[in-house]
Amino acid sequence: MLFRSDFKAVMITHEHTDHVKGLRIVGKKYPHAEIYMSKGTWTALKDNYRPEKNQIHLFHPKEKFVIGDVVVAPFSIHHDAVEPVGFILSKKNKKIGFITDTGHICDEIFERIKYADLLILEANHDEEVLKMCSYPYEVKRRILSEIGHISNITAGRVLCRILEDSEGPVYRQVLLAHMSMENNTPEMAHLTVESILRERGLFTFPSRYYFSIGHWVVF
């Protein structure tokens, strides 16, 4: 994990090891940092990952909180964790949406993320690559389930729906995130998402639709 020395806070989405294994180290290295997580996540967090209690700020998934001049609105997501969340961060009239580790995007989640100016969206795997990989059957079934991870195809469909539900000119920046190192590549994710958008005619009206798609985190 790399941080600026003056960073103020860490927000935890859920207790799975790939998201918290460095948390205790970060807490010791940056004792000034505030660490935010849901009450359920704190309860499920293993002792060897827990930072000092005085750094911890617990929240309910339906209650907003403030970090500096940023308003944070957590929301529940669909993952096999105790109380997993995504986030909407708002400052003035700009919004950042963050959602990874969810098996599907329900209507409630969609309403939360559709107005984000910058959306960090999971595109975890290519479904066919996952089905052919060496993972045990139970692991594959978990990933593909409604409490697993969303695929490149699902990410593309979510972005289509955002555009189709929007009125007037649309500008969005999207970072595809939480990509599997075994079952995805940034190039594969970009190609799939762009192909889905093109099939729906959403790249043919640049005066109305503008999407900037990049990639951010690979797991």
Locate each region found by the language model.
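Metal-dependent catalytic neighborhoods of phosphoester/phosphodiester hydrolases
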Residues: K21-Y30, K46-N48, N184-L191
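Active-site environment of divalent metal-dependent phosphoester hydrolases
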Residues: H16-V20, T43-A44, A81-V82, I105-D107, ...
